[in-house]
Amino acid sequence: VSTNDSTHAPFPGHPGAARRVSDRLPVFPWDKLEPYKRTAEGHPDGLCDFSVGTPVDPVPELIQQALAAHTDTPGYPTVWGPLALRESIAGWLHRRMGAEIGPEAVLPTVGSKELVAWLPGQLGLGPGDQVAYPKLAYPTYEVGALLCGAEPVAYGDLDELDGSKVRLLWLNSPSNPTGRVLGADELRRAVEWARAHRVLLVSDECYLELGWEAEPVSVLHPSVCGDSHEGLLAVHSLSKRSNLAGYRASFVAGDPVVVRELLEIRKHGGMIVPAPVQAATAVALADDAHVAEQRERYARRRGALRAALEAYGFRIEHSEASLYLWATQDRPCWETVAELAELGILVAPGDFYGPAGDRFVRVAFTATDERVAAAVERLKR
């Protein structure tokens, strides 16, 4: 058969192929920022990049040592990980989050983003189902719905949702991008709503140890969910707290029935955290000192950038937790992005996180002390 026959359908994955998955998805947001990044890189003193919240400080030595000590692991690791890892996760949840949970109800994941993106599909959601997430939100919540053919629904209040159609409800506290923290009363209301409608509630808590003017609470805390985790999952990451974005070290915890279902699915898909990273994760979660040290770094950078931005004319809203300042000049976000790029400063436009953010920018304080100091100088009028 001639391979040049124009009557043949395109190969799967080629342009024009039926059901090409990427056609469902929006343009990858960071690609739109590239022209502004090039402008900022042209500054004589170089780029001050506050756009992506990626760690820049060293991986703590004890974590590096744990990783190195487990590099001679030629065999396949397990999806669930060793009991020591799951006990470390459960111990951290109890010690730091006040959650009573056993090792049978936790599951390591290959970073938190892959879980967010693939969770709806792994739980069998599809056409006719709704995945709900906050109006200002991490874009991957929407992507996760689109990947499995479900309908993404952005909400401002739970009363806007049709509980008969929503199958998965995302919470995010502290919020990316706004840094807003949901109080225990708000979390309880969400849990009650989800349970009343038999909706799985998944709380993205990746910034929970980074509260500044507020003390974030986990959805798994007894004051929020009572004595049961039924219908609840919490997602946690070591990327920010331990500078492990390069390790892809995260986990999900909560309803043991749902965790077991995810385990069975992920075993078939081979979604496995490498054994050295599993060992490093267990050590990282058992140590609080390196987290306190990193918090001090972020607190200094946050204070310096906040003061400089406010002096420049920005208003900061929320931002009581997480690694971001949610800033506005009360004008379109891309105008602000362009203005700051001329100063060699790159920030994320607020509309990356939904139309409600179109007059804000997100400023990540994850750059080095030297780059933060450089930006502070450039913002002086």
Residue locations for each model-derived region?
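Short beta-strand to alpha-helix junction loop
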Residues: W80-G81
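A short acidic, glycine-rich active-site loop
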Residues: T73-Y76
